[in-house]
Amino acid sequence: MEQVVIVDAIRTPMGRSKGGAFRNVRAEDLSAHLMRSLLARNPALEAAALDDIYWGCVQQTLEQGFNIARNAALLAEVPHSVPAVTVNRLCGSSMQALHDAARMIMTGDAQACLVGGVEHMGHVPMSHGVDFHPGLSRNVAKAAGMMGLTAEMLARMHGISREMQDAFAARSHARAWAATQSGAFKNEIIPTGGHDADGVLKQFNYDEVIRPETTMEALATLRPAFDPVSGTVTAGSSSALSDGAAAMLVMSESRARELGLKPRARVRSMAVVGCDPSIMGYGPVPASKLALKKAGLSASDIGVFEMNEAFAAQILPCIKDLGLMEQIDEKINLNGGAIALGHPLGCSGARISTTLLNLMERKDVQFGLATMCIGLGQGIATVFERV
């Protein structure tokens, strides 16, 4: 079986969804920009030699509809002979895109693929056109489709207080801002055209979603966003709404070395698991455990974790049940997470994997794990190994 390696990984800055940097930039353009950039950064690989493009996107309608993967590839002037497919596993879409490409390479059906994902939540809101079947309420709680209420449920089940959530949210912004100031994101962010507050076209090379002024005291003044009577989850402890894209160049190790391209990491194992939709945010726990089992590793072997921060109330129970509460500041989301950077649904899997690879290199660790919860009760995880 072929070894699957990540040769390169990049992302756009994360733009605010409401009147942000990418308010006049379409999702296809964000995607095409990264496709072009990956190919330009790795000229040893001819675009025509790509076997496929796998691109995650959740709200596949309006500008994100009709197979955005192919539309973006055409905009990027990728040769017409290269196919492209859009992948949807809700929040896990671009990580699923990575898994799909990895399996193709493992079986010898592909040698080189572009993978990634995008979501423009400003142009195509998360709730646009959603129409759940009324019969679902016979099988799952009605609130299972309301992500904020599932986070409230997890907080109550695991004893996660409002103060714990606010502290974690403040940490996310502080870590992300520190990473920005130190240049830690420089190796992953590709400057991307957008418009500033005055409408002037400029190149953005930073995440505008981060709020460096965030404090626990300020967060404590916010009202519950989903359960106004007894809730603890606020907008401040939830992932921000943002627009962005992320992309990776994935190859067989033999082809990468043949072309003189240096692999950054191997895909050591992959896992996807279902869970009760009412606690959809718990999915990273069984998914991570399965991925670790497949890799022949334990949580203690992992040097760095990237866990998508859908809600502080959601990620903290996952950290607790993976036995990592005492190692948060040493191993988990060291550059902040989605509470500060946002969670553009179809982009986030590739985004956290990209950030993870850079952290693994900076910290000089052998193994890293990226994982995320998925709406309606799933979890997805990937174990990476430095080459």
Curated annotation (Swiss-Prot):
One of its GO terms (biological process) is phenylacetate catabolic process. The active site is at 91 (acyl-thioester intermediate), 343 (proton acceptor), 373 (proton acceptor). GO terms for molecular function: acetyl-CoA C-acyltransferase activity. Gene3D superfamilies: 3.40.47.10. Keywords: Acyltransferase, Cytoplasm, Fatty acid metabolism, Lipid degradation, Lipid metabolism, Transferase. Pathway: Lipid metabolism; fatty acid beta-oxidation. Signal peptide: none annotated. GO terms for cellular component: cytoplasm. It is found in: Cytoplasm. InterPro entries: FadA (IPR012805), Thiolase (IPR002155), Thiolase-like (IPR016039), Thiolase-like_sf_Thiolase (IPR050215), Thiolase_acyl_enz_int_AS (IPR020615), Thiolase_AS (IPR020610), Thiolase_C (IPR020617), Thiolase_CS (IPR020613). It is an enzyme of class 2 (transferase). It catalyses: an acyl-CoA + acetyl-CoA = a 3-oxoacyl-CoA + CoA. Transmembrane segments: none annotated. Its EC number is 2.3.1.16. Heterotetramer of two alpha chains (FadB) and two beta chains (FadA). Belongs to the thiolase-like superfamily. Thiolase family. Catalyzes the final step of fatty acid oxidation in which acetyl-CoA is released and the CoA ester of a fatty acid two carbons shorter is formed. This is 3-ketoacyl-CoA thiolase.
